[in-house]
A protein has these predicted regions:
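Bacterial N-terminal signal peptides
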Residues: 9-20
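Bacterial N-terminal signal peptides that target proteins for export
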Residues: 1-11
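Short polybasic amphipathic segments
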Residues: 59-67, 128-138
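A short, surface-exposed beta-strand/turn
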Residues: 113-131, 135
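Boundary/junction segments of secreted and surface-exposed precursor proteins
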Residues: 23-41, 175-192
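Residue-level detector of buried hydrophobic side-chain packing
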Residues: 34, 102-104, 134-136
Length: 192
């Protein structure tokens, strides 16, 4: 019986060490940039410019500008609070592809100050099937004030109506650090 408990204790200790060591992702933190436009289900055009990543010496960096020409909404970032890996892979040439969630706060002309997140996906080159989605919530989270999540097409070209490019960049010495941060606009994805 003592032998079983010894093996059990060793297994629990190994699991605790694994969990305490941080993210299970082997992907190094990187950065993402992008710009373009999407066509909302209403037919309105919305332009965006986005960037984000890990930053050596501080947790995250980035920016967001977004304008919906149908509603007149204008969003200007004021801080970046999180940068998260959604999924990662490489294309046939070894270049990184995948999606990232960038989170922050912004001021808007319609809702005042808000929390937000963007999911931006790089599907490879050319960027015709890249994707962009945005959600705005009251500060501290809550029911979305604005979102493109329910729209039928988030692509930036190809067979879709939008245009632009999302580019996931390889890690470099200035983007060292862990994925993570806080994302009140996406409450099940906080901490890090």
């Amino acid at each position: 019986m003592r032998r079983i408990w010894t093996h059990y204790a060793f297994g629990v200790a190994a699991l605790a060490l694994l969990l305490a060591s941080g993210s299970a992702s082997a992907w190094e933190c990187d950065f993402l940039t992008g710009g373009g436009f999407i066509i909302r289900d209403s037919g309105a055009k919305a332009n965006f410019g986005v960037g984000g990543g890990c930053k050596h010496g501080s947790p995250t960096w980035g920016h967001l500008e977004y304008q919906d020409h149908g509603t007149g909404l204008n969003v200007h970032w004021t801080s970046i609070t999180g940068y998260f890996e959604v999924d990662s892979n490489t294309d046939s040439r070894g270049k990184p592809i995948g999606a990232r969630r960038i989170c922050g706060t912004a001021r808007t002309n319609l809702y005042g100050d808000v929390d937000w997140f963007v999911i931006a996906r790089d599907t490879g080159e050319p960027g015709v099937d890249d994707e962009f989605t945005i959600r705005l919530t009251p500060l501290g989270g809550g029911i979305p004030l604005y979102t493109t999540e329910g729209d039928s097409d988030h692509t930036l070209g190809g067979s879709g109506p939008g245009g632009g490019n999302i580019q996931l960049h390889n890690p470099n010495p200035s983007t060292m650090g862990p994925f993570g941060g806080d994302c009140p606009a996406f409450p099940t994805f906080t901490g890090g």
